[in-house]
């Protein structure tokens, strides 16, 4: 399954970009990043179908890493070919996008800079795929 991160803002050469790259290199599933301007631009349609859309949103569900892995694993096993992860800019996502998403996820109650959220998402995607592969990286409790 392709993991497609669609993020507002250019990450450029930054410590956050280094973190994203570090975890992206470890992910054995397909990986793609599309950057959009902070304002304007349109979210591209899925490259593959069937697909799922996950919006990173402060009002979303707070999942454990194992719960997140289970969702991705179920989608993969159900034949989903692409999961798109949308990271908004400073103002987040509009209501229409939130309503159209298959899942809303939050990284806790705090508000995170969108560049840091991208690095956190990359780590969680690595962790989820490693859990599904039975890799010892993740430890519960």
UniProtKB/Swiss-Prot annotation:
Catalytic activity: pseudouridine(1915) in 23S rRNA + S-adenosyl-L-methionine = N(3)-methylpseudouridine(1915) in 23S rRNA + S-adenosyl-L-homocysteine + H(+)
Binding-site residues, S-adenosyl-L-methionine: 88
Record's keyword terms, sorted: Cytoplasm, Methyltransferase, rRNA processing, S-adenosyl-L-methionine, Transferase
Enzyme class: transferase
CDD domains on file: RlmH-like
One Pfam family matching this protein: SPOUT_MTase
Localization, UniProt: Cytoplasm
UniProt cross-references to InterPro entries, sorted A to Z: Alpha/beta_knot_MTases (IPR029028), RlmH-like (IPR003742), tRNA_m1G_MTases_N (IPR029026)
Keyword S-adenosyl-L-methionine among UniProt keywords: yes
SUPFAM superfamilies found in the cross-reference section: alpha/beta knot
Enzyme Commission identifier(s): 2.1.1.177
Any single Gene Ontology cellular-component annotation: cytoplasm
Function: Specifically methylates the pseudouridine at position 1915 (m3Psi1915) in 23S rRNA.
This protein's name: Ribosomal RNA large subunit methyltransferase H
Annotated source species: Novosphingobium aromaticivorans (strain ATCC 700278 / DSM 12444 / CCUG 56034 / CIP 105152 / NBRC 16084 / F199)
């Amino acid at each position: 399954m392709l993991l497609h991160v669609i993020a507002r803002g250019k990450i450029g050469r930054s410590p956050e970009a280094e973190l994203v790259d570090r975890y992206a290199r470890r992910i054995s599933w397909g990986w793609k990043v599309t950057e959009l301007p902070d304002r304007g631009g349109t979210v591209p349609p899925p490259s593959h179908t069937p697909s799922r859309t996950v919006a990173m949103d402060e009002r979303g569900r707070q999942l454990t890493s194992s719960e997140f892995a289970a969702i991705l694993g179920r989608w993969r096993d159900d034949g989903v070919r692409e999961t798109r992860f949308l990271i908004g800019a400073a103002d987040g996502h509009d209501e229409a996008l939130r309503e159209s998403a298959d899942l809303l996820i939050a990284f806790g109650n705090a508000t995170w800079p969108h560049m840091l959220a991208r690095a956190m998402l990359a780590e969680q995607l690595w962790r989820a795929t490693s859990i599904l592969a039975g890799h010892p990286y993740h430890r519960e409790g």
